[in-house]
From Swiss-Prot:
Coiled coil, from the record: none
Domain comment in the entry: Has three domains with a flexible linker between the domains II and III and assumes an 'L' shape. Domain III is highly mobile and contacts RuvB.
Gene3D superfamilies xrefs: 5' to 3' exonuclease, C-terminal subdomain (1.10.150.20), DNA helicase RuvA subunit, C-terminal domain (1.10.8.10), Nucleic acid-binding proteins (2.40.50.140)
Protein name as it appears in the record: Holliday junction branch migration complex subunit RuvA
Gene, per the UniProt record: ruvA
Keyword Membrane tagged: no
Family statement drawn from the similarity comment of this UniProt entry: Belongs to the RuvA family.
Domain of life, per lineage: Bacteria
Upper classification of the organism: Bacteria, Pseudomonadati, Pseudomonadota, Gammaproteobacteria, Alteromonadales
Amino acid sequence: MIGRIRGLLIEKQAPEVLVDVSGVGYEIQMPLTSFYELPELGQEAVIYTHFVVREDAQLLYGFISKQERSLFRLLIKANGVGPKLGLTILSGMTAREFVACVERDDIATLVKLPGVGKKTAERLLVEMRDKLKSLMEASVGSEREFMLQSNYTAPEAVNTAEEDAIAALLSLGYKPAQASKAVSSVYTDGMSSETLIKSALKSML
């Protein structure tokens, strides 16, 4: 089990990052809420991970805090929720916001996320209510750990912020027309990819 990775952040293309640890590059998929908290390229980061072994692949999912990872682990234990949908849920809202949805029985917000229909949302609210009791306090005071050391200069990004944002939304399950419309509606000159992704997601919730 790989539970934590500490290394140099050498690639960032939402929702995936590449971290160099002693010459070995680890590809890690992250929810966008954690992705936003990452340091710049060339700096060192600590990422808490969940390791999944499948017949055709070995996958690492990464989180900025232990509490967010704990919530992800609870989510994928829910009926009908796999790692991909778990990442989508935590990309559309923070751990704290998800806890608030469960507390309020807020189906309307959950069904706005791609891949979450009414039945899935109802099932999530029922199954997660008891599981979250021990997690709620921890998620409010989540620790965020970064180790920033390096003078590495990152190469210039090839893709535009709009292209990056649309690609990130497509990876979360949004349709091309939805992604393009959301990005276009919030884009202003000078926006970074991360700010644009965050704004586009908020516009759809």
